[in-house]
């Protein structure tokens, strides 16, 4: 995870090592770059990652805008977010809280609302919306835990919590909380929790099909009924 950091810091003095603590944006950037190499087999060179990954660009712009907003600076945070959306196709409100090591893969069409919270090392695919459900004030966007995978086109709406290591199936519409280590699939989504199973975060071929499971259960009950006739 910290391979890039070690490459840059190896052989430098303690003063340079302490510099990481004073430059949180640089620390976050190295974490974001490292997670891209870990999760994207298409990433082959650091220069390519720095120049050609819009998800990385959007996160860098957001961290800058968020920091300025926290300092009470008007206008500039929203302008940076607006410019970032124009350049990357990714809309992250400056008020959103985004953890470290987040990977926005492909990214086009991703929307993250003002009061959304995204935990560390989450994987977000293109077309994802972390949005609200109306004009309510206060916390009105989702809180996403750590190591969560949100599939392409999924919509997570309202003041709900997505637990750590949860998975959201592609195209799902999530309107209620998802417990940790569970999967939400469907429109509207249904939670499926499998005990003692740990799926690879990048493997979307093993997502549970709740409709198919219900059909199998119905067919099994019909078969049992026939045996008693």
Feature-to-residue mapping (PLM):
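Electropositive phosphate-/nucleotide-binding environments in soluble metabolic enzymes
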Residues: 23, 27, 58, 74, ...
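Membrane-proximal helical "anchor" segments flanking the first transmembrane region
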Residues: 25-61, 65
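Extended, small-residue-rich solenoid/repeat segments and analogous flexible loops
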Residues: 56-105
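Acidic, low-complexity intrinsically disordered segments
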Residues: 177, 181-223
């Amino acid at each position: 995870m910290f391979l890039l950091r070690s490459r840059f810091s190896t052989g430098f003095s303690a003063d340079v090592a302490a510099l990481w603590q004073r430059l949180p944006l640089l620390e976050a950037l190295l974490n974001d770059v490292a997670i891209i190499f870990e999760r994207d087999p298409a990433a082959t060179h650091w220069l390519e990652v720095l120049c050609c990954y819009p998800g990385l660009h959007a996160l860098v712009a957001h961290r800058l805008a968020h920091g300025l907003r926290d300092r009470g600076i008007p206008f500039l945070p929203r302008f940076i977010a607006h410019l970032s959306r124009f350049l990357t196709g990714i809309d992250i409100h400056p008020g959103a809280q985004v953890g470290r090591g987040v990977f926005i893969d492909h990214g086009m069409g991703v929307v993250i609302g003002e009061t959304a919270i995204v935990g560390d090392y989450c994987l977000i695919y293109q077309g994802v919306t972390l949005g609200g459900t109306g004009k309510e004030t206060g916390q009105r966007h989702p809180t996403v835990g750590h190591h969560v995978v949100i599939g392409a086109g999924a919509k997570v709406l309202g003041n709900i919590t997505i637990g750590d290591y949860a998975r959201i199936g592609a195209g799902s519409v999530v309107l209620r909380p998802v417990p940790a280590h569970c999967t939400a699939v469907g429109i509207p989504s249904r939670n499926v929790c499998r005990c003692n199973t740990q799926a690879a975060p990048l493997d979307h071929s093993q997502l549970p099909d709740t409709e198919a499971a219900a059909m199998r259960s119905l067919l099994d009950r019909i078969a049992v009924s026939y045996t008693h006739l």
